[in-house]
Regions:
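A short glycine-rich, Lys/Arg-flanked "PGG" loop and its adjoining helix->strand segment in the class I
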Residues: 128-143
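A SAM-dependent methyltransferase catalytic signature shared across enzymes that methylate proteins
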Residues: 186-204
Length: 246
């Protein structure tokens, strides 16, 4: 039996532990992007059994924290460091410092699920290398949910048309993380996932309503929203894949 997504319980936990929590983004980021977190938690509910699981959130830890508060999952977070890790540790998550770009995985076949949300676009290296490291951390048959911006999203088309820089400079990070150094098309992401050795890959275009930061682009977003009926222009790719069962 899969889990039941309860919107009221999700909204309550999201407000208390995410919007009022201590994370890296500016305070109004999390109210604006609630729909993304809700969509990914719904995906998780569709795939996860009702019994508690061991879950790893690679990145900020918000999804792992929601799993802990909603279902008492054994939730872990792995990141390169930051004050947000103290906050999630105080909320009951296990914390591991891990630089995905330069370090081999500190786990082997430990996790039922891994959340890899809005991270791969920040990493200046082939995606299949980091995905292979995550595969090692999964139990046989364990699953990964990966979300990342769609290369062909409407925002990028507008940026290219007006000559605005789309990506951060591609370089080795020094003492801090990078912006988006690359984004993936659906076929490119599929190739990277399959190259890593993960199996049963399924990727879909998703549009998760939000309000852009810049007021000008906020107006353009709403004016152009009918174009999201065309899947290729949607903002986000959501991929689900599985570690080999053997």
């Amino acid at each position: 039996m899969t889990r039941i997504y309860d919107a009221q319980k999700f909204n309550s936990a999201y407000l208390e532990f995410i919007c009022k929590g201590s994370f890296n983004e500016i305070p109004d980021y999390y109210p604006r992007y609630r729909s993304r977190y809700a969509a990914l938690i719904k995906k998780y509910c569709d795939l996860a059994p009702s019994t508690p699981l061991k879950v790893l959130d690679v990145g900020g830890g918000q999804l792992g924290l929601l799993c802990k508060k909603l279902w008492n999952d054994d939730a872990w977070v792995a990141d390169i460091g930051g004050a947000h890790l103290d906050y999630v540790a105080a909320q009951g998550l296990q914390v591991k410092i891990w630089n995905l770009c330069s370090e081999e995985p500190p786990f082997k076949e430990e996790f039922d699920f891994i959340f890899f949300s809005e991270v791969i676009e920040h990493l200046p290296m082939p995606g299949h290398i980091v995905l292979e490291r995550l595969k090692i951390a999964l139990k046989p048959g364990g699953m990964i949910i990966c979300s990342t911006p769609n290369l062909y999203r409407l925002r990028n088309i507008v940026y290219m048309a007006i000559g605005k820089q789309i990506f951060d400079y591609f370089r080795i990070p020094e003492n801090h993380g990078l912006g988006h150094v690359m984004e993936y098309s659906i076929d490119h992401l599929q190739w990277q996932i399959e190259k890593s050795g993960l199996e049963n890959c399924h990727i879909e275009y998703c549009q998760m309503p939000h309000s852009p930061n810049d007021p000008v682009f906020r107006v353009m977003y709403w004016m152009g929203s009918p174009l999201f009926l065309v899947p290729r222009f949607r903002d986000t790719l959501v991929a689900i894949a599985q570690a080999p069962s053997n």
